[in-house]
Amino acid sequence: MYKRQKQHAKNPIHWKSWSLKTLESARQQDKLIVLSIGYAACHWCHVMEKETFTDPNVANLMNSQFISIKVDREEHPDVDHVYMDFLLETKGNGGWPLNCILLPDGKPIYAGTYFKKDQWIQLLSRFQFLYNENPQKLKDIALDVIEQIEFQNETYSTEIFKVQEDWLEWVKFLDLE
């Protein structure tokens, strides 16, 4: 078990490790993935752990509707890098904890940092509703955002604002902010 998982072993969320087996489980169960990346010295990681991840309502939602993965960025800098890039490209800033919602295939559809308990429940509930109602729409949107990011990275474009504008339109669709 990774250090990060040991640190969170007593909270009620059934955290899994980052592995092919876990990703395959998400695909087989057709469940969205909650990916939470942090590190031991991260103040806001500890705050979110205490205020959000120990809440029974949060745990019930995450355990029943999502595959939840906890990653220590110091043990998996490669994973952190991929999803931090997504956060930076879509929001313009980053930080930890890095919390992402992924499609069952691991493609990111949302990323943020610290969330209060009520914000987290609202966000997860909204994504679960959208995925149940029209999973293909979420897949199409995720693919569009990823293609824009890849295109911009390939051409070294400075047009990050275009991705951010598209992301803001996507967030409006979610009615989260």
Label every PLM stretch briefly:
Residues 3-177:
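Replace the tail clause
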